[in-house]
Amino acid sequence: MSSMQMDPELAKQLFFEGATVVILNMPKGTEFGIDYNSWEVGPKFRGVKMIPPGIHFLYYSSVDKANPREVGPRMGFFLSLKQRGLTVLRWNAVQEEVDLSPAPEAEVEAMRANLPDLDQFLGPYPYATLKKWISLTNFISEATMEKLQPESRQICAFSDVLPVLFMKHTKDRVGQNLPLCGTECRSYQEGLARLPEMRPRAGTEIRFSELPTQMFPAGATPAEITRHSMDLSYALETVLSKQFPGNPQDVLGELQFAFVCFLLGNVYEAFEHWKRLLNLLCRSESAMGKYHALYISLISILYHQLGEIPADFFVDIVSQDNFLTSTLQVFFSSACSIAVEATLRKKAEKFQAHLTKKFRWDFTSEPEDCAPVVVELPEGIETA
């Protein structure tokens, strides 16, 4: 890790007040990063010093000793660091991952006493990118971090999965009425059906909030079903009341957490959750009047997040539809309405103009959502 030019007074303050993360025995050549910076670890690497207090994301990819070009999947973990805090971790050579088990207090204190000698082996936190990091994580509290991270605390780009049913023998497949593997598939769907159903290993999945698949209340009339399918405020209120009863703005922390897990942790499931949560927020027209402060903050969050991703990233390869433009088109049609609180409306108008200028996205066409909506009615409900 190369040193960076830093204001001497700031460097002195961070040296005495910043946190330190010591990682022992990390192999040479490992790709290691913290927040918005990553490096290839050298033989003298022992960790990072002068880290500003707060939430940080550390990540790494192990390399094959025989073939250093072979890089393993990215692993990562969040830490909430305190002023002058010291966290001591070590590399597990067998599992090829950082052991997140708390170090004994005696070892931590011994390491603290030895910090002056260890200093030359600690890389300074790259302060130049701190502002960008804060803009992407300012709603992630320690409580949000603890709530969402896996029980194992390790966030892996590829899920550690197990089969739902262990079927080692042909008779096991027959018992589940599944096609025998020796026969030829007659369709793509049949081929998919033959694949074993998998589930994440217990304790390894990110604990995102469960989002509703039914957007309307039980017993809703056909007219109510149509209304709730166009304006998702009922579904959003359900999520906020169940998952974030104390502070609705905590939903923004989850949105940022998912984005960081995708952007820096390479977790595709996190990107899918980010899309679903954003879709729920952007299509809740009635909620914008009740939670206008939340939506003002949402615009700021999206401004910073969209600055990190290429404009064509959200385009579906097959349909060529852009998820983000269609979602934001619905959002702007509501947020820029005269009925919306003035501060939110003005911020939405400026954000729309910014995106149009930067990405050349068209938000003026009639959104497809304004077309008649065909809604599948629950069993037992008949139209008049």
UniProtKB/Swiss-Prot annotation:
Biological role stated in the UniProt entry: Component of the U5 snRNP complex that is required for spliceosome assembly and for pre-mRNA splicing.
Quaternary structure and partners: Interacts with PRPF8 (via RNase H homology domain). Component of a U5 snRNP complex that contains PRPF8.
Coiled coil: none
Family named by the database record: Belongs to the AAR2 family.
Organism, as annotated: Mus musculus (Mouse)
UniProt KW Ion transport keyword: no
Protein name as annotated: Protein AAR2 homolog
Domain of life per record: Eukaryota
Keyword terms of this UniProt record: mRNA processing, mRNA splicing, Spliceosome
GO biological process: mRNA processing; RNA splicing
A Pfam family of this chain: AAR2
Keyword Transmembrane helix: no
Gene Ontology cellular component list: spliceosomal complex
